Structure formats: C-alpha cells, structure tokens
Amino acid sequence: MIIYSPLWQTMKDKGITSYALIYKHNISNGTLYRMRKGRAISTVVINDLCKAMKCTPNDIMLYVSDEENAAQ
C-alpha cells in the first residue's frame, strides 16, 4: 500500500501550503483530496509535485506492506 504521509511533512518542512500547490503549481484540489484519502494518483501528478516542491518521490510517498499496515 502506498501512503502519502511524507507529502504533508515535506510541505511543512518546505513551507508550502495546499493553497500554493493548487493555485501556483496547478495541482488540483481533487488530487490533494485523493492523496489525503490514500487513493491512487498518476505518475504525472507525482512528477508535478516533485517539480513544484523540488523533491523526490520518496519525499511524497511511502510503501507500507499489508502486514505492516495491519499491525498499525
């Protein structure tokens, strides 16, 4: 399972708001909603987020095995 908790920490660390992603970097509100809910996003969106925040995919998402997720 892919989780997006690193995104929120990266945004905080870099001082980037959801507002800035939506209005300055054209990331849709729907995309951020899907990420908050743990739903799938495209590689194009991952690329756009990395470009906007000058980071890597590891700064945006994390793989957690089903066993680890069940233990939490």
Question: Where are the predicted features?
Answer:
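Short, charged recognition helix plus adjacent turn
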Residues: 9-10, 34, 61-72
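Short alpha-helical DNA-recognition segment
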Residues: 15-33
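Short, basic-rich loop-to-helix N-cap that marks the start of a DNA-contacting helix
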Residues: 39-51, 69
